[in-house]
Amino acid sequence: MNKERIIQEFVPGKQVTLAHLIAHPGEELAKKIGVPDAGAIGIMTLTPGETAMIAGDLAMKAADVHIGFLDRFSGALVIYGTVGAVEEALLQTVSGLGRLLNFTLCELTKS
């Protein structure tokens, strides 16, 4: 029996690898993500993973958003709130990580 193996590697460094805004998510998607009735969802992935805790703090201080999911091991962060609040939180979090911690940044994307 052949088993497929997947190896996930992180490169050393400080990086925001994804910052994405989902405006007006469908009911099914929001429910699957675990944030039903969200006007918008923000998704971030960060390296090193522990940065998700700092990003969550920055996001909540930047705008009226809530944390839907945070994983300090994988570096995943999901926030939710209104479209304007989530967009502002993502923008301020990305710029804050660059300014305060000298992270390599990515552009905010939207759908």
Swiss-Prot record:
**Record flagged with keyword Nucleotide-binding:** no
- Give the induction note: The first gene of the 17-gene eut operon transcribed from a single promoter, induced by ethanolamine and adenosylcobalamin (AdoCbl, vitamin B12). Expressed at low levels following mouse infection, not induced in infected macrophages or in spleen.
Quote the biotech use from the record: Artificial BMCs can be made in E.coli by expressing eutK, eutL, eutM, eutN, eutS (eutSMNLK) or eutS alone. Cargo proteins can be targeted to both BMCs; beta-galactosidase (lacZ) was active within the BMC, showing the BMC allows passage of substrate into the interior. This can lead to the development of tailored BMCs for specific metabolic reactions. The addition of eutQ to the eutSMNLK construct results in biogenesis of multiple BMCs.
Give the phenotype of cells or organisms lacking this gene.
Not required for aerobic growth on ethanolamine (EA) supplemented with cobalamin (vitamin B12). A non-polar deletion mutant grows on EA from pH 5.5 to pH 8.0, but does not grow at pH 8.5, releases increased amounts of acetaldehyde on EA plus vitamin B12.
Report the protein's function.
A probably major component of the bacterial microcompartment (BMC) shell dedicated to ethanolamine degradation. Expression of eutK, eutL, eutM, eutN, eutS (eutSMNLK) in E.coli leads to formation of a single BMC; expression of this protein alone can also form BMCs (which may be less tightly closed than eutSMNLK shells). The 'bent' shape of this subunit is required for integration of cargo proteins into these BMCs. Coexpression of eutQ with eutSMNLK permits E.coli to make cells with more than one mobile BMC, as is usual in vivo. The ethanolamine (EA) catabolic bacterial microcompartment (BMC) probably concentrates low levels of ethanolamine catabolic enzymes, concentrates volatile reaction intermediates, keeps the level of toxic acetaldehyde low, generates enough acetyl-CoA to support cell growth, and maintains a pool of free coenzyme A (CoA) and NAD.
Read off the PANTHER family from this record.
Answer: BACTERIAL MICROCOMPARTMENT SHELL PROTEIN EUTS, ETHANOLAMINE UTILIZATION PROTEIN EUTS
The name on file for this protein is Bacterial microcompartment shell protein EutS
Origin species: Salmonella typhimurium (strain LT2 / SGSC1412 / ATCC 700720)
Taxonomic lineage from the root: Bacteria, Pseudomonadati, Pseudomonadota, Gammaproteobacteria, Enterobacterales
